[in-house]
Amino acid sequence: MLLIIITEPGFFDGEAGLINLLFEHGLQRLHLRKPDSNEADFESLIKQINPQFYNRVAIHDHHHLAVRYNLFGIHLNRRNSLAPDGFCGSVSRSLHTIEELSADKQKYDYVTLSPIFDSVSKVGYNSQFTPSVLNDLRDRNLIDSHVIALGGITAYNIATLPQYGFGGAMVLGALWNLKGDREMFLEYFERLRKKI
C-alpha cells in the first residue's frame, strides 16, 4: 500500500525541513495542500524541498507550478477542478460520497475517499463509511488499488485498511500534531510506514 502524507493547510517554521526529513526516511508521496496560500508562499515552500524529491510531490493548489517544477502530480478538488494546459503528470481527485466514487473513480490516476474514520484535524468531520459499507464497496470493486483512504488515519487504524481493498492511506493530523517534537514526529512516521 502507498503511504501519502498531506501537509497542514497553514505554513509553519521548519516545515520544509520536516518534509525533506520524511522523504529521506522513505516517504513515497507528499501532497502539498495550502488552500489559503498565495502563489509566492506556495512556490517558496516548493523551492525549499530538495529537487530530487519533486517526482514524489503532488500539489492541490497553484497547479501551474507542477509544470514549472516538473512535479509528480496535481490533485483536483472543488477549488481547483481543472488540470493546467501542458500538464502530463499524475492527476488525482478528492471524493466524498459513494455516488462520486462510482461516477468518477476511473477518470483519474487515483482518488482519495474521505472521511474513512472520524477526522483528527477537522473537529466534527465524522466518517460516513461503516465497516459494512466499506466491505460492500470493496466487493463491488468500487474500492481498489486506485482508491486512497483519507480521514482519521492513525498508526492505530491504518492496518485495517487493506481488508477493505484500499490502495493506500493519506495521513494529515495524526502526524503533523507531533511536528513540535522532531524525534516523536519521525518515530510516528516510522510506525505508519511499518503498519501499512
Language-model features and meaning:
Residues 74-85, 112-125, 158-192:
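Glycine-rich phosphate-binding active-site loops on the catalytic face of alpha/beta enzymes
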Residues 1, 7-10, 76, 114, ...:
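Active-site pocket-lining/capping segments in soluble small-molecule metabolic enzymes
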Residues 16-28, 79, 101-113, 160-163:
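Alpha/beta enzyme core
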Residues 57-72, 76, 96-108, 137-143, ...:
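Catalytic cores of alpha/beta
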Residues 9, 34, 78, 95-97, ...:
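Short secondary-structure boundary segments
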Residues 43-59, 86-98, 127-149, 155, ...:
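Alpha-helix-loop-beta-strand connector modules within alpha/beta enzyme cores
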Residues 23, 27-87:
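N-terminal active-site wall of soluble small-molecule enzyme domains
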Residues 1-16, 92-95, 148-149:
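Active-site mouth loops of central-metabolism enzymes
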